[in-house]
């Protein structure tokens, strides 16, 4: 069967390519999935589209936030033919998907039929935010500063706020602060951030500072803004080189007794285990409930839904038009 896929060919260049997918002789851990929608994961994909991340070569097939229906499957796939599923794979109209033996590997989860498939493309963003929130020690009345109000930053801030914490979001892009407020975040600032944090924390620093940018200088801001015995959550993935004297940062961690927490998403089990529900399955259930109940209005995150052939302009907008561009979703139904 014919499949179309997004391919990054050079810095800032991408196009839609095609290939033939063999759909016969499926292994037990394989499935043929027809994609309906997929979301561009801006942080990860822009790092490759514009060569921010080092150590890879073009061409590259980006993407991992996919929603589609199973056409055929092997016996070990925990979903049925015809089921709507969220799965990890590069952007493509048709995918021969395979599980792996790693801690998580490629992920596939059955979606409830009342979940909007367009909104479900944001599932990975929810899973990242949920794991980050759950890794921190939270108490009622805690004050939280979330640095970076991209998609994951906004979701993380809203989740902390739902737990009853006082949360402030920080981003230099005014449009992102405005969007966060539209989605229900009470406090978001794009300038005079130190003054805002001092006012919120009575000058003592926040209990939890979250880096949702992956930018090393912002991690230093987190260390400076957190109180003594506070927590710094590294939710973004650092990719860009940054030269600095590390001693001041290490001194802050040491002198303030700060707990620094790494929050890479792929570190918890996929399935629930006896005595613990700290798993992707449980976070997936929570994310579906948040979407279903409109506790978090995912649609407001999505700037536009486009034909995948317009992929090059999509990456350009996400990189250079941050004020008006947030999440972008590909519509694959015509392919």
Q: Each predicted region: which residue ranges?
A:
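Glycine-rich beta-strand-centered segment in the early N-terminal region that forms part
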Residues: 23-40, 49-91
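Helix-to-beta-strand junctions that scaffold the AdoMet/dcAdoMet cofactor pocket
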Residues: 226-228
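C-terminal capping/lid region of NAD(P)-dependent oxidoreductase domains
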Residues: 203, 233, 242-243, 289, ...
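Hydrophobic/small residue at the entry helix of a nucleotide-binding pocket
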Residues: 128, 152, 176
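C-terminal substrate-binding/catalytic core of Rossmann-like NAD(P)-dependent dehydrogenases/reductases
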Residues: 247-302
